[in-house]
Structures are given as C-alpha cells and as structure tokens.
Amino acid sequence: MGTHGKRIDMAENRSKFSTLLDQLNIKQPEWNALTTSEEAIEFAQKVGYPILVRPSYVLSGAAMRVSYDEKTLKDTLDLAVSVSSEYPVVITKFFTDAREVECDGVCDGENVFIGAIVEHIENAGIHSGDATMAIPPQTVSNEVISKIEDYTNKIALALKIFGPFNVQYLVKNSEVYVIECNLRSSRSMPYVSKSRGINLMRLAAEVIMGGKIPKRLMNLPLGNYVSIKAPMFSFMRLDKADPILGVEMSSTGEVACIGEDFPDALMKSLEAADMNVPIDGGNILISVGGDELKNQVIPLAKKLKNLGFTIFATEDTKKALNKNNIEAVKLYKVHEYGMEPNIMQCLQEGRIDMVINIPLPTTVKEKFKTIMEDEYKIRRMAVDYNIPVIINLQLAKAVIDAIKNTREKKVKIKSLNEYHQTLKEVYW
C-alpha cells in the first residue's frame, strides 16, 4: 500500500533525487555530499558563501546550519558529523533574498492533486515550521506559479507517488529551484486542507487504499479569500532561549486564520498566536545592525511615523532615521546601563509596545560581540515582558501594512463553514 519504499528513498537520498531532477530538467541549488572539512571548504569557495549544511535524513531541520564564512563552516560541519556520522553531510548553496514556496498534494500514480501553493512571508532561511504562510501566494508571479505547478506534477509522477507529498521550492529572480520533496503528510497539510475545503488526509488515505482522486476535484478554484498560518512559540517558558529564527525549527504550535484579504488574515492569525500588535498607536523600538539593514528599515519607519507611532532607537539607528527626516527618541543600549533613557528600563516599565529587531548576519558575530549580546537581551526582555517582537524584515513590513488595513476597515469574523459555503465543493 502507498508509495513504494524505493521511491521514498529516491526522494530522501539527495544524490538519487538530484539525478531525477536533472532528468526532468528541473533546477536545484548547487550541492555536494562531503565527509571532510577540506572538501567542504573547497566546495564553499567554489559556489560562494553562504552555504547550508545538513546531515541526511533529518526532521525539523535538526543540526542544519547556515554558514557565512570558513570558521562557522568548520564549526557547523563538526556538529553535523557528530549527529549523523554514518552518512555524508549535504552542503548546499544558500540563496539570500529568495522566496520560499511549497506545495502540499496527493498523487494516485496517474493524477496529481495540488492542494495549494503556499508562500512563506519571510524570505528563505526560516524553517517551514516557523514560517508565516499565505494561501494564495502574494508576491510570486503567475508565470512562477505555473512553473511550480508543472514541476510538482512532473516530480510526483516520476516518483510514482501513491499518497501524500510536499515539495519545497526557492524562487530567485523568477527562477524556480527545488529544495526537496517529502513523501509524507507535512505539518502544513491540515492548514492547506481547511483553507481549500478539501481534506487532503482523507484523499491520501483513500489513494493509499487503492482509490483514485475524483476527477471533479482536479480543477476546483481557490476560495475568494486569503488564509494565513502563523507559528506559536514557547520562548516565555524557555528561560534564556533566544527568540531568533533560522533553518532549525523552534515553534511548538501553529494557528491559521482566514480573512477577506492578506492584511486581514495576517492580523487575525497574529492575534490568534497571542501576538498583541498595537493597532491604535504607541511606541515602537527599532534596533537593526549594519548600514544595509538600516537602509532597508527606513521605508518601514516612515510608514510607522505616518501611522502616528513614536519611534525609539539606539544612537546609530536614530542617526540613520534622522538623515531620512524621521524623528526618533534616542535610547541608550543595554550595555550602557545607568545612562537614561535605557532600553532595559523602557522595556521593564512597559513604555515599548512593539520591538522590531533585525539581527546581524552570523558572519559578523565575532566582530560585534557586544552588539549581538545587546540584541539578544532586547529580544529576550521583550519576550519576558510579553512585548511583541519581530525579527524579520518581510514580516515587519506585512505587519505594518496590516495595522494600516485594520484601522481603515472593520474586521469581519466568520466561521470556517461560512467561508467554505462560498466554495464550489467541500470534500471533507
């Protein structure tokens, strides 16, 4: 019953799956399976940093790391080998500023049903279990969506899947690359099922038992609404844990909400995840490292000012904002304790309503150790005092747009059944 074990291994074994993608003429990030530090360094020098290091056969991104330079690569490789010494470590070129998209579906060996194409709000580099997701995709083009549908069909049929599957993609400059294909029910499948009104788990079980996908389901349109899946974390219960996200999964749960449009659904999902975003105004602390990040946060700060928020910032960030005619209240850094007003003091006294802290890349941690410690303390204190903290630029932009949208139009609450009643068919 179900997908043959050899086909599952073909998808899980990076070398075999890579060969299949080459045969299908489908792009993938450059990669290699290596066993020594010397080989890894040589490969990294060839393709360029950053690179992603991961052991074979892992779940939830266990032992996965992004390496930005030779030193962090050696440290990461040592960790990966200790986790899975029997298998070569897979090292892959890591794309910065790429979008991540995935598909959940069911195949009966002849027909491929794509439940939904799901776009991550955050750029690639955040584990799918920690990512905020949107159905339908909000930023990728129709051309890219068509290509993803085509690739998904080709992969599912080539693997002779009988049951559920999940395919993850990278989108960079309109080029589509396959990350991996999992021949199982993914954690996002319940979310996709409720969004579509089609129970993919039921469909997969029927196929595994020898059934076929009903033809009438193949071309059903999406509903005229947007659904968002948001992660939930337990950082408040994990003393001293850094609430920062990466390729290794940190979330302990998730919520999903449906709205009339993207901002509506996002705000509902954040509220459901106990993230108390200030809607009516307040004080926002912006703390970012490096000139590039400061330049990227300028448009967000302008939107916040236009919405009536008061911006607090440390000295360098304040200077960058002032250069762009954005007023900000200066706060002294955490390690400058005793100087007032200080970040720690403002967080403790509840004078900050939301924190936007975009961390520095790993590659500069050694150079800016004090700054990194400050950033950690800001994030940690925000969690301890139940202050919303956003550590991703794309999510910050989406949240600010959602605040504006929520002010302009009344939020409508509907049951899942009410949304499903607008669909052509519900298969549950």
PLM segments and residue spans:
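Glycine-rich phosphate/diphosphate-binding loops that line cofactor/substrate pockets in enzymes
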Residues: 43-47, 271-284, 304-305, 346-353
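Short internal beta-strands
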Residues: 285, 308-320
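C-terminal functional extensions of proteins
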Residues: 389-428
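A conserved helix-loop-beta module that forms one wall/lid of the active-site cleft
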Residues: 3-64, 323-332, 390-402
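Active-site rim loops that border cofactor/substrate pockets in soluble metabolic enzymes
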Residues: 282, 318-347
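ATP-dependent carboxylate activation and anion-phosphoryl transfer catalytic cores
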Residues: 2, 20, 24-25, 47-50, ...
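Short hydrophobic/aromatic-enriched beta-strand-loop microsegments
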Residues: 1-3, 325-338, 407-415
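Glycine/threonine-rich flexible loop motifs
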Residues: 295, 361-375
